[in-house]
Amino acid sequence: MDSASRQHVALIAFPFASHPGNLFAFARALAAAAPDITFSFLTTTFAAATLPPAPPAANLRLCHVADGVPEGGLPPGTTIHGRIGMFLRATPGNFRDGVRAAEEEVGVKVSCVVSDAFLWMTADVAEEIGAQWLPLWTCAPAALLAHVSTDQLRERFGVEKQATAGWADELVDFIPGLSCLRIRDIPDEIVTNWHSDLSILLHRMGNQLTSATAVALNTFDGLDTTIDAALASLFKKTLPIGPLNLLSSPPPLQPGDEKCLSWLDGQEDATVAYVSFGTMVLMPTQSDVSEIAQGLESSGVRFLWSLREEARAGLLPPGFLERTAGRGLVVPWAPQVRVLGHRAVGAFVTHCGWNAVMESVTSGVPMACLPSFADQKTNARMVSAAWGIGEALRGEKVTKEEVVRSMEIVMMGEEGRRMRERIGNLREKAAEAVGPGGSSSENFKSVLEMVRGTAN
């Protein structure tokens, strides 16, 4: 096929937390469905190292872009927010350079730019080269609706923490789709931490997305029809294509994975609480780890806890591992998708990032939510108050008593049984959506048509 008839698509990742992995899963699905198109995946060297180890498709290429880190390396004490700021100051020039380099290497001009929705400036990059722009929102639909409604929320409640404190329990019932959320559940970047680099980025994003031809979403029809309708009224077109975790097979087992899976094999059905807060989350505090440990011990439930070695050392209460050895297992890492799909797991204790929520839903496992930052508070509220598939932390701090209470509700009580029934129904809807003829499958076909330039 000559270069005049070939097509070239650039995918541009927001290189932090779970964002690169989500866009990469999407990229692999696109590459598998369109083997005649070349896909160039643009991300930083650091983020590329976090992607799944399995080799990509022959028509999917990894391309590195500048991350904004000074030549001498990161200054001592640089936080994740500092790294985000450095990266954003390198944009959009690094994207222009990356697209130009990809075009030279492939020998074909880019005709479509698919980006993480966070990166609103990629719309300008696409326009400059005459390509269409398709943003993918990988987080919760409720969080997206909140970000698009930033100006309304700030006008109503202000932006300073001291000003919004008195509104903490006020319902956001004046925005269709967010009526069950309280101000305390809204992402900090909207109403308190408004001057940060990330807040400015997301505010601009909320304004830019309304001009996109379509916005692809990591959700599925039937999860929340009210939010779906609200987003559909704000954007030119919405394309729910999720859950993204169902677009690809679980990663291959790593050395040591069999230990926790074998341990689960020896447990009764739905008797184990799986505890994990992700691999990219900020280091938990000693107080949080200690309170969770005490809560698990006092609750009497069986548990599998994925806790990194550096978080475990010196943070667990003295003697905890010995006292719970008969009914608990603490491991440095666990194959989460496989663990959640195991018959023995009856609850997921999570910070409630959107990936975790989707993996829990598609496994049919109710959640005990201990949110920490970003959209986690929003997700926890939706899980507990809107969908009834989990129990959320009461108050702002993790306590032993809250862990015990959530375990009793999710693992032992009648409400826990109803949660399992509700999340089981959502699991079926998610499977139907990505199945043959399902809504997400059909929307994915629409994305392919956009990528090919054949959409109406």
Swiss-Prot record:
Organism superkingdom: Eukaryota
Keywords assigned by UniProt, alphabetized: Glycosyltransferase, Transferase
Chemical reaction(s) catalysed: myricetin + UDP-beta-L-rhamnose = myricetin 3-O-alpha-L-rhamnoside + UDP + H(+)
InterPro entries, alphabetized: UDP_glucos_trans (IPR002213), UDP_glycos_trans_CS (IPR035595)
Binding residues for an anthocyanidin: H19, H147, A374
SUPFAM superfamilies xref list: UDP-Glycosyltransferase/glycogen phosphorylase (SSF53756)
Binding residue positions for UDP-beta-L-rhamnose: T279, A334, H351, N355, E359
Molecular function terms, GO-annotated: quercetin 3-O-glucosyltransferase activity; quercetin 7-O-glucosyltransferase activity
Pfam families: UDPGT (PF00201)
EC number(s) from the headed UniProt entry: 2.4.1.-
Cysteine pairings via disulfide bonds: none
Residues annotated as transmembrane: none
Tissue: Expressed in young cromes.
Pathway: Flavonoid metabolism
Active site: H19 (proton acceptor), D116 (charge relay)
Free-text function comment from the UniProt entry: Rhamnosyltransferase involved in montbretin A (MbA) biosynthesis. Catalyzes the 3-O rhamnosylation of myricetin to produce myricetin 3-O-alpha-L-rhamnoside (MR), a precursor of MbA. MbA is a potent inhibitor of human pancreatic alpha-amylase and is being developed as drug candidate to treat type-2 diabetes. In vitro, is able to transfer UDP-glucose and UDP-xylose with 50-fold less efficiency compared with UDP-rhamnose. In vitro, can use kaempferol or quercetin as substrates, although these two flavonols may not be physiological substrates in vivo.
Family per similarity comment: Belongs to the UDP-glycosyltransferase family.
Protein name: Myricetin 3-O-rhamnosyltransferase UGT77B2
Name of the encoding gene: UGT77B2
